[in-house]
């Protein structure tokens, strides 16, 4: 499997999402901050991504790009008809409002390290935000997908 370099990912983000700012860039890791529009409001998000490393302890952001909504915070709805308390997220943080978004099924091949984050993950996150706003309004998730299990040791 070919793996895109961090430099390739950064260049693609600059080209397609110029308002996203690189907050940290190392040889094998990058973090961006930027804004995405839902249907009714803007959201400030963070994207964390790292190249896979066999010798390193497994972390979620080395398996795939991790997107968290920073503001406004995700609002849990424990009474939602479906997907309570939050739809399609990975519950890896003690603060569930900062849970990484579940945007694709890695095991089903929906994303790989050869994909450009700017052309896959970011547009999918914008779509997720629109579906999230619908879920907030009616308590049903219309974003599709299935929950991919993340082994506990890979969630850190």
Placement of each model-derived feature along the sequence:
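Order/disorder boundary and secretion-linked terminal/linker segments
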Residues: 1-24
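Compact alpha/beta protein-protein interaction domains typified by the UBC
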Residues: 18-106, 116
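Domain-level detector for trafficking modules
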Residues: 83-156
């Amino acid at each position: 499997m070919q793996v895109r370099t961090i430099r390739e990912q950064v260049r693609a983000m600059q080209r397609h999402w110029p308002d996203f700012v690189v907050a940290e860039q190392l040889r094998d890791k990058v973090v961006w901050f930027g804004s995405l529009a839902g249907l009714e409001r803007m959201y400030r998000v963070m994207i964390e991504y790292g190249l896979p490393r066999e010798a390193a302890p497994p972390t979620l952001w080395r398996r795939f790009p991790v997107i968290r909504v920073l503001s406004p915070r995700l609002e849990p709805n424990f009474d939602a008809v479906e997907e309570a308390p939050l739809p399609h997220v990975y519950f890896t943080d003690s603060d569930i409002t900062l849970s990484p978004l579940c945007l694709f099924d890695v095991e089903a091949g929906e994303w790989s390290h050869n994909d450009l984050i700017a052309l896959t993950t970011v547009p999918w996150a914008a779509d997720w935000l629109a579906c999230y706003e619908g879920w907030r309004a009616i308590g049903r998730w219309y974003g599709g997908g299935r929950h991919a299990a993340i082994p506990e040791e890979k969630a850190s």
